[in-house]
Design a protein with these regions (language model features):
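Membrane-embedded transmembrane helical bundles of large multi-pass transporters/channels
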Residues: 1-70, 76, 168-416, 531-729
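Structured non-transmembrane domains adjacent to transmembrane bundles in polytopic membrane proteins
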Residues: 80-197, 413-581, 587-606
Length: 729
């Protein structure tokens, strides 16, 4: 009896606690909703002030953006603690040299080369100019120079000579790129400037010319899509104006990072437009619904539309931000650069969507009404019934396609040669090809060794390096002079170039191209030799840095993929209070990514290394928006008492148009830029994103509802908000 009473009291206590929790939850939810409505009413009331402030903020944002430095040196984003980057710092600190270029001189006499060398050396940013005449002066005759050194700087068959130019700052500095541009003008008729400094200079020229065009293309194509899929000409313009202002705010706040990469600059506006367009579309659709609800009271309708948009967009925007935040976990800090800027962009996009855009719509209400037209896109919501009737077939297609998609995804070919991203018309690319053709010269390595290394060790180390496969030339000051020439016969200029303070510099010329398997194996062998002679010696240069880039980004990709999946999994878990939905949604979205990234594995298309890292996170973040929209409607329908099939069919029918419009805008913005850009890194990323938008659209419209049909019982049993106990009682 006592046990029975105790159990009864416990049961009543549990009922009481549950009731209290339920009541508290409802009250909190009501307060949040009321707060959002108050915010919406505040925006409507102060819409003129909001527009004045918004337009005024464009001025400081624009000034800040103009004064934000753009970094064109991708390798500078490698971790500072690795040996190649430490060696780079030593080069700058000890030798006053941060980069080098090879200049191919055709049909020029020695006296003309000497004059040109003096002119180049006078350029701001140039430290030294080295050619065989630098060493072979009046005190050291030509006959004293080893034939291999002379041949490395001369090609009698092509009647050309080679000049090595070193710069006082790194290859991505403004001073170095300006020096390269001036040098190009000086030597353009009969000479070619090769090397990464020249590639960076060409990249800067192309990006600064093309970046504004990217924005124009993305905006025009997005407006074309919205013009077809919406009932107004003016509203798409207001969308673009609102998003454009958010983009300027985002770019204007990049000063907090000191600088941004050229890749971030080129992609930010396009991606922010494509990713945040969803929020504008949602606000407009919600506004239209609220107008019907409140009998044409547009101010009240807008206040409630803002409230609904904030509540609905919060979950999807957080997941999108999470995808970009995952990039910040990369050791290769280009990910941090892009991740921070894009995460900020989403935040500014959401803020603009619930403040600036409503104010613009209300301000332009009369014009909007006058310019309305018939929607040209057919109503595609009818496919919902077909999907729920054929979900088993679609589930089989999912499984059948998944296996080859994963195979293709794991067999993608990736390239790391940064010079390879340039178009064939780029002057630096032509110079690099000529350098390879006339001098069989691919990568150039630099050895930084202690200056007190004995002459014998220096010569022996160089001789050992010469035996490594693919080494065309290996020289130190000691190896050039040999054991018989005394130091006092060496020109002071040559001494200062190769030896300075605590370190000496040695050059190794490779026949292999940067980022190739052959050169990476060569670097490993040379490092072993160098370390045998001195633990303090370092091997640096473009190829060793690129080898580190390969190793680091391979680890980064796995880390970023894991972090992005975990973050989005947790966000879906919290938003839907479900154990099963995060698994289903992430699995379906990853399937879309596998299909997109698996296609190049079958076509044999080589992708730039950064593409695989960036695409995964951006497509994950963007696709989850579509998935959350449909899942929210599915949950609402089930909660109102609808059976499985009608609930899923209605959710799909209500979501399809929004998903298609959003995906097509994303596709249009990125595909247009991908076709136009002749910088392969930018073009490849945009084409992949465009294709990913279409694939994600099909997956969300066809595969996700099929998963809901199959796992409905599991979802309802493991998720909050799918069952209304008042209806089932």
């Amino acid at each position: 009896m006592d046990l029975y009473i105790s159990h009864d009291k416990s049961k009543r206590l549990n009922i009481y606690l549950f009731g209290l929790f339920f009541y508290t939850s409802i009250r909190i939810k009501e307060r949040v909703v009321n707060l959002m409505i108050k915010f919406g009413k505040g925006v409507v009331k102060h819409r003129v002030l909001i527009l004045i402030v918004a337009f005024a903020l464009l001025i400081p944002s624009g000034i800040s953006f103009i004064n934000t430095r753009i970094n064109f040196d991708i390798l500078s984003y490698l971790p500072s603690q690795i040996e190649t980057m430490k060696g780079q710092d030593i080069m700058v600190d000890e030798f006053g040299t941060g980069a080098l270029s090879f200049v191919i001189l055709e049909d020029m006499k020695d006296q003309d080369i000497e004059t040109l060398a003096d002119d180049i050396e006078d350029l701001e940013g140039v430290k030294d100019v080295i050619w065989y005449g630098t060493i072979a002066d009046s005190t050291l005759p030509r006959e004293a120079i080893p034939d291999e050194v002379y041949d490395a700087f001369n090609n009698k068959d092509a009647n050309s000579q080679l000049m090595l130019v070193t710069y006082s700052d790194t290859m991505g500095s403004d001073e170095t790129m300006e020096a390269v541009n001036k040098m190009d003008k000086m030597v353009k008729n009969h000479c070619f400037v090769a090397g990464m400094a020249a590639v960076n200079a060409d990249t800067k020229t192309l990006v600064m010319q093309q970046a504004p065009i990217y924005v124009i293309i993305a905006a025009l194509l997005s407006m074309l899509v919205m013009g077809i899929t919406m009932d107004s000409i003016i509203v798409p313009m207001l969308f673009l104006l609102s998003i454009g202002m958010a983009i300027i705010y985002n770019l204007g706040t990049n000063f907090i990072q000191g600088q941004i990469s050229y890749l971030t600059l080129a992609l930010t506006a396009v991606l922010q437009l494509a990713v945040t367009m969803d929020y504008s579309i949602f606000l407009w659709h919600s506004y239209q619904e609220q107008i019907d609800r409140y009998d044409g009271d547009k101010k009240r309708a807008m206040a409630h539309a803002i409230s609904h948009t904030i509540v609905s967009v919060t979950g999807s925007s957080i997941t999108t931000i999470a995808g970009f935040v995952a990039l910040c976990f990369m050791s290769f800090t280009l990910g941090l650069d892009l991740g921070i800027v894009m995460a900020k962009g989403v935040v500014f996009g959401v803020i603009g969507c619930v403040t600036i855009l409503p104010a613009l719509i209300l301000a332009c209400d009369k014009v909007i009404e006058k310019t309305k037209h018939k929607i040209l896109m057919p109503d595609v919501s009818r496919i919902a019934s077909w999907v729920t009737n054929h979900y088993k077939i679609l589930a089989v297609i999912f499984i059948v396609v998944l296996i080859p998609a994963i195979y293709g995804y794991t067999h993608d070919q990736v390239y790391y040669d940064l010079a390879g991203t340039m178009p064939d018309s780029a002057y630096s690319k032509q110079a690099n090809e000529r350098l390879d053709k006339e001098y069989a010269m691919g990568a150039t390595h630099i050895i930084i060794a202690p200056s007190d290394m004995s002459k014998a060790d220096s010569i022996n180390m160089i001789n050992d390096i010469k035996k490594v496969d693919g080494v065309k030339l290996a020289v130190s000051l000691d190896s050039i002079l040999g054991p018989t020439i005394p130091d006092d016969m060496v020109p002071d200029e040559a001494k200062e170039i190769f030896k300075n303070g605590d370190y000496q510099m040695m050059l190794v010329s490779s026949k292999y191209e940067t980022a190739s398997d052959e050169v990476n194996n060569q670097i490993t062998e040379i490092k072993k030799i160098v370390k045998n002679y001195s633990e303090d010696a370092m091997l640096i240069g473009e190829a060793p840095c690129t080898k580190d880039l390969i190793t680091i980004t391979d680890t980064d990709f796995k880390r970023v993929s894991a972090v992005s999946i975990v973050l989005i999994f947790l966000i879906i878990l919290v938003v839907f209070k479900s154990v099963s939905l995060p698994i289903i949604l992430v699995a379906v979205i990853e399937f879309a990514i596998f299909v997109n990234m698996g296609i190049p594995g079958f076509t044999g298309t080589k992708l730039p290394f950064i593409a695989s890292i960036v695409i995964g996170t951006i497509q994950l973040g963007a696709t989850v928006d579509y998935a959350i929209l449909m899942t929210t409607k599915y949950r609402k329908n089930r909660y109102t008492g609808m059976d499985k099939k009608p609930a899923i069919t209605k959710a799909l029918a209500d979501s399809t148009n929004s998903v298609i419009v959003s995906a097509l805008c994303f596709f249009a913005a990125t595909f247009g830029v991908g076709l136009y850009s002749n910088i392969d890194m930018i073009s490849s990323i945009c084409i992949l994103l465009a294709r990913g938008a279409i694939i994600s659209m099909f997956v969300v419209v066809f595969i996700l509802p099929s998963m809901f049909m199959i796992f409905d019982k599991v979802i309802c049993a493991t998720s909050a908000g799918f069952k209304n106990k008042n209806l089932t009682a």
